[in-house]
Amino acid sequence: MKAGIHPNYKKVMVKCACGNEFESGSVKDEVRVEICSACHPFYTGRQKFASAAGRVDKFNKKYGLK
């Protein structure tokens, strides 16, 4: 690798919208995410299938399908 052309990789705190914070590595000073493993439905086991069914019903209603 060439010296002096790569950004400095450092440890930073990643902050989620749910309030969870964890340490990771990045070239940025601060990292903010909307969803993390602490609040993602796949990892928490609280998956919501009703929202998908609601979208299907809305589509069927819009296009007159039964």
Swiss-Prot record:
Keyword terms of this UniProt record: Metal-binding, Ribonucleoprotein, Ribosomal protein, RNA-binding, rRNA-binding, Zinc
Listed cofactors: Zn(2+)
Residues that coordinate or bind Zn(2+): C16, C18, C36, C39
Coiled coil region boundaries: none
SUPFAM superfamilies: L28p-like
GO MF annotations, alphabetized: metal ion binding; rRNA binding; structural constituent of ribosome
Superkingdom per UniProt: Bacteria
GO biological process, one term: translation
InterPro entries per UniProt: Ribosomal_bL28/bL31-like_sf, Ribosomal_bL31, Ribosomal_bL31_A, Ribosomal_bL31_sf
Quaternary structure (record): Part of the 50S ribosomal subunit.
Function: Binds the 23S rRNA.
Family designation: Belongs to the bacterial ribosomal protein bL31 family. Type A subfamily.
Listed name of the protein: Large ribosomal subunit protein bL31
Source species: Anoxybacillus flavithermus (strain DSM 21510 / WK1)
